Design a protein with these regions (language model features):
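Beta/alpha (TIM)-barrel catalytic core signal, keyed to glycine-rich beta->alpha loops juxtaposed to Asp/Glu
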Residues: 9-186
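Phosphate/pyrophosphate-binding loops at sites that engage ATP/ADP/AMP, CoA/4′-phosphopantetheine
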Residues: 1-2
Length: 186
């Protein structure tokens, strides 16, 4: 292979480093990089995306979007109008809490401290608690059907991919059972 299909770069790094932007432009021009995807992981980068949409030079953005974290919808719509790709991360709310905890916790009563108590990462995640809480905590159980104690993960994936402006949802699994549950929406 003579080219990278997708080069993922953190938005803040891309915007703050002119030499990086120039080098990526050169590599794209030379055919060494086919597509640039800006990662919108941090809150400031997410807000810029929600407010303005994609950067003109980017071919796609990787953004946080799920059933309980919908703040990216304006940016996603703007990206679609501009013909840009939209890749979704954290479709299942990230790895900070188990799916069981996401479904069984009463998030109307819970606080950020509840998230720290439930997460196996505990205090080590305090520095990014605002961000993690925004995409982990919320009414996941609303995705359950009558008689289900826990919403199937496929329901969360289905909710994300039903947005016609979403190009792709990145979903992580660790077992055949998790894979089958996530794919149940197809």
């Amino acid at each position: 292979r003579e080219a990278l299909d997708i080069l993922r770069v953190h938005h803040y790094g891309y915007m703050e480093d002119e030499a990086l932007r120039e080098r990526i432009a050169e590599l794209k021009e030379a055919g060494k990089v086919r597509s640039l995807c800006l990662i919108r992981h941090f809150e400031k980068d997410q807000q810029i995306y929600a407010d303005r949409g994609p950067e003109p030079e980017a071919d796609a953005d990787l953004v946080i979007y799920n059933y309980v974290c919908r703040g990216q919808e304006p940016g996603i719509a703007t990206a679609a109008k501009a013909g840009k790709g939209v890749l979704i991360m954290k479709a299942l709310g990230g790895q900070y809490l188990s799916w069981q905890h996401k479904n069984s916790t009463d998030w109307s009563q819970a606080t950020e401290e509840t998230l720290i108590e439930l997460s196996p990462l505990g205090e080590s995640m305090r520095h990014e608690l605002d961000l993690v809480y925004s995409f982990s905590a919320g009414p996941w159980r609303d995705l359950a059907q009558a008689g289900e104690e826990v919403a199937p993960t496929g329901s969360a994936v289905a909710w994300v991919i039903k947005n016609k402006n979403v190009s792709s949802a990145l979903v992580a699994v660790a077992s055949v059972e998790e894979l089958q549950a996530a794919l149940a929406c197809l």
